[in-house]
UniProtKB/Swiss-Prot annotation:
Binding residues annotated for GTP 1, in chain numbering: 9-16, 56-60, 118-121
GO biological process: ribosome biogenesis
Residue ranges occupied by any EngA-type G domain in the UniProt entry: 3-166, 205-378
Protein name, per record: GTPase Der
Molecular function per GO: ATP hydrolysis activity; GTP binding; ribosome binding
UniProt family annotation: Belongs to the TRAFAC class TrmE-Era-EngA-EngB-Septin-like GTPase superfamily. EngA (Der) GTPase family.
Key word GTP-binding present: yes
Organism: Photobacterium profundum (strain SS9)
Positions of GTP 2 binding: 211-218, 258-262, 323-326
PANTHER family: GTPASE DER
Amino acid sequence: MIPVVALVGRPNVGKSTLFNRLTRTRDALVADFPGLTRDRKYGRAELEEHEFIVIDTGGIDGTEEGVETKMAEQSLAAIEEADVVLFLVDGRAGLTVSDEAIAKHLRSRDKPTFLVVNKIDGIDADSACAEFWKLGVDAMYQVAAAHNRGVTALMERALAPFAESLKGNDEEGLIDLSSVEDIEKADLTEEDAEAAYKRLQEQPIKLAIIGRPNVGKSTLTNRILGEERVVVYDMPGTTRDSIYIPMERDGQEYVLIDTAGVRRRKNMNQVVEKFSVIQTLKAVEDANVVLLIIDARENISDQDLSLLGFVLNSGRSLVLAVNKWDGLDNEVKERVKSELDRRLGFIDFARIHFISALHGTGVGHLYDSVIEAYKSATKRISTSLLTRIMQMAQDDHQPPMVRGRRVKLKYAHAGGYNPPIIVIHGNQVNDLPASYKRYLMNYYRRSLEMMGTPIRIQFQNSENPFETTKQKLTVSQARKRKRLTGMIHNRRK
């Protein structure tokens, strides 16, 4: 059994810094002000050849109001999940009432707990740590997480009871929730496309839930999971990190990615907000399918369209969910649908669902569209079928003339998946106008019944081996030309 280590403490004592140090990532946001981490965030870490799971939590300071009360609940839940608790305190700030309150709670839980005095670099560590003995601990560990001082010794001691059970666990599969590997762009060859297809079949479906702040992303995530896994509060921006959560439904494995709400650039008053947006956009790149949430009670904004554009440019499959649909009268619903048709007509390949994440209305149908979009994006298509469809499209509508010559399409094959890439070979294909390229893309979409995914078509000119060589007559051709030239000359006389 892989041990679970929870990092707890009041705000801004360095929990996220230690999380990043252990997982060797920057997946937990770090900045020099309290309250930055709000959800339980899971990551995989390794000590020598042994693996363990780390949980980063929001801070508890005993003065929680509003959303911070929710954050405290997440921290307490992490304590219950953990096999080992690392209780972090700030060596520079000294002992506080909040530290004493947390220590009291931890004593009541009867969990293996290690007191970790962080930020001891540049100070007299022994003097700074002396007052923390009041917490009644058996052992104290001095670290500087930002500089990796004392971290290895701490983890060796904390994981010592699990050392025997950790041996031989290397073969166990563990999804890395903190640094999910990017799907590589497939090269334009059939062999690499096949390799990309096989790689995708071995992975769970990664579903990123994105949208502007406060449209209901975390509410939907919790509805899907059936627990208060992600902080939900009626205030924009309560999710700042991208949260990776594994789940299974009807035998299909998923990794849900709940992202920070993306807001307009002018509203990003803090560096942290900008960094969260970067994490969101990285989550889109990492996903197989993107579920974009739109607020039914607000007009479609330029930010919604900007997000759509990013998803399409990334080549990710797309499902749209119009949230907060409950409670709207019929007139408002018709107006919203009309607005969607007018402004989102360019993504007619994506399914649109009208849901209430809070009450669960319509949420179950989202899975059908997610599966449909994923299957469309990863559908294996033979070269013969792609070539046959290309020929049918060419017969129905001939390519235009380019410099007095008809463009000729020869054959097509798969070049990659997620998104599907179709490679068409022919003469002068790079000179095809954009209108004919769109025609081919739509023809393939209809013929292959692809729904929920963009299609990319790459064109490659077939090389003419004689294009750069100078034609040279054979001996017999030269004699014939000379004889014909002589005959013409004699007739003129």
